[in-house]
Amino acid sequence: MKKVKILAMAILAISFGACSSDDDSSNNNNIGSIAGRYDLTEFNTGAATDFNQDGTASTNQMDESSCYDGRRIDFNSDNTFTYDMDYILIDTSTGVAVCADNTVSGTWTATNSVITATYEQENGTEVTLNFVRSNNGRTLTQATTLTTYPDRNSEGVAYNRVGSVTTVFTKQ
């Protein structure tokens, strides 16, 4: 009986030791730990592009253009957010590309490791964005499967390619 008790206590100790307070799967909805500024650190696309035409293609579009450098999200402790969406705007009739920006505001909620941010476009359409938290909440990742991102054809004319995009934001 004494051996069974010791074995049970050992199993219990191991099971408690296997849990860690920094597990990304923990239910960490602490608003204070989420609130803050997150800067875009990666804009990864399904296919590599050479948008800046330097001879080196990259799947991280931040290596191809400085147009994304100001993209950031501010999550506030009152469950509101502001998203500065710096991007590349392409005139599809001319193939000319320019840096552009748009700022949206809305509300956010958190469930486990997912932050859901919702805002309304000027035309009244509601948009929902889902960000997965990792790295102890310091990293947010958003994956989109069917979206557009900038590319160039063989003549160097800019166009919108359809594919997957994964953006990564890092808390400052």
In which residue ranges do the predicted regions lie?
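Short, linear, compositionally biased motifs with a strong N-terminal bias
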Residues: 11-13
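Lipid interaction determinants
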Residues: 20-107, 111-172
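C-terminal motif of bacterial Sec signal peptides marking the signal peptidase cleavage site
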Residues: 15-18
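Bacterial N-terminal signal peptides that target proteins for export
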Residues: 1-7
